[in-house]
Design a protein with these regions (language model features):
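Protein-protein interaction interfaces in oligomeric scaffolds
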Residues: 271-289
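Short polybasic amphipathic segments
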Residues: 85-93, 267-276
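A structural signal for short, hydrophobic beta-strand segments that form beta-sheets
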Residues: 204-212, 266-270, 283
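Beta-rich globular "head" domains
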Residues: 86-89, 172-201, 244-247, 251
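Acidic-leaning, charged glycine-interspersed low-complexity segments
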Residues: 259-264, 273
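Conserved short "hinge" loops at termini or chain/domain junctions
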Residues: 1-165, 174, 198-212, 218-243, ...
Length: 321
């Protein structure tokens, strides 16, 4: 599942454009594609500005240089796509020679959020490899005179946030169930949404605890007539990111809705019949949108929010020669 399963057209209607007349002149509602495209555009924009990947993205053969000076720091790498969910393959190669695999267990994530990993040999595998001159090699030290080898390490990994959904059961007579994720969320606290599919006499639900591996759900009273079925959605998307995307995605529908209040660029109009007249004024003009005040408010909120998110997610790259 993806972020678009959380930020849907209906989500935008129910939150950021609530109270706005979202119908065309003929009375038909705005089409879903208007909101879907606005959401997709907002997701891409926020991803680009923060330098992170929201939905799972598999990267094959990302190359990183080897420097002798990094030996004492256990070869730190900052991967190109963040946050890092898992590393599937770790290899070495000189130029275009065939890849030689290293144990994946050597890749230790030190900051999944910032894509930082280190190469730390494990005790059970270190004997199979030689460390001559600081660069790990399979056979001898033929490259040891070199202080720098470009593109020496090749890394396959998966980046992005985690979104899982499913159904769990609280057995009859019991009051608690564990939701276990298929993978650890590392540094991030998950968000959990619950829905009772079949109560079977059970009481209200609450989340007892959450962890990077899942959550514990309890019911106020045990089901009495059968097993209680519960649908869950659990993810680690930052709530501030969801808000930023919602604010940005709402601007396009608000722009269109403002034009349809009285017509594009029309600030007021009057109607007169048989000596009776009526005037209608709006906040729209040739240069201002009908919902301009809300748009300006959203833009200001977005600017403040993005400043905080950049400080949290952006990395500082330091290069040495």
């Amino acid at each position: 599942m993806s972020l678009s399963s959380i930020i849907t057209p209906q989500f935008i209607r129910d939150t950021y454009v609530l109270g706005v007349d979202l119908t065309l002149d003929d009375g038909s509602p705005y089409p879903d594609i208007l909101f879907s495209q606005a959401i997709e555009s907002a997701i891409s924009t926020i991803e680009l500005q923060l330098g992170i990947q929201f939905d799972p993205f598999k990267v094959k053969g990302e190359r990183h240089d080897a420097r002798i000076s990094n030996k004492s720091a256990f070869y730190p790498f900052t991967l190109d796509h963040r946050p890092v969910k898992s590393v599937e393959r770790l290899s070495i190669s000189l130029g275009n020679y065939p890849l030689v695999d290293l144990p994946v267990s050597w890749a230790v994530s030190t900051s999944a959020q910032h894509g930082q990993i280190n190469l730390i040999p494990t005790g059970e595998t270190i004997g199979s490899f030689l460390f001559r001159g600081g660069i790990p090699l399979l056979f001898g030290d033929i490259f040891s005179p070199y202080q720098y080898v470009p593109g020496y390490f090749s890394i396959d990994y998966t980046s992005g946030f985690t979104y899982e959904e499913g159904v769990v059961v609280i057995p009859q007579g019991e009051t608690e169930v564990e939701i276990t994720l298929s993978e650890s969320l590392a540094e991030t606290k998950p968000t959990v949404a619950l829905e009772v599919l079949d109560a079977q006499g059970g009481g209200a639900l609450r989340i007892k605890s959450v962890s990077t591996d899942g959550a514990t759900v309890v019911t106020a009273s045990a089901p009495t007539t059968g097993d209680m079925q519960i649908s869950y959605k659990i993810h680690n998307y930052d709530p501030a990111i969801i808000k930023a995307i919602g604010l940005l995605a709402a601007i396009s529908p608000l722009d269109i809705a403002g034009d349809l209040i009285a017509g594009a660029g029309i600030g007021s109009f009057s109607v007169g019949v048989d000596g009776l007249s009526q005037s209608i004024g709006t906040t729209a003009s040739a240069t201002s949108a009908g919902y301009g005040a809300r748009i300006i408010s959203y833009q200001k909120q977005l600017k403040d929010l993005m400043g905080m998110l950049r400080a949290k997610y952006r990395t500082v790259n330091i290069f040495s020669v």
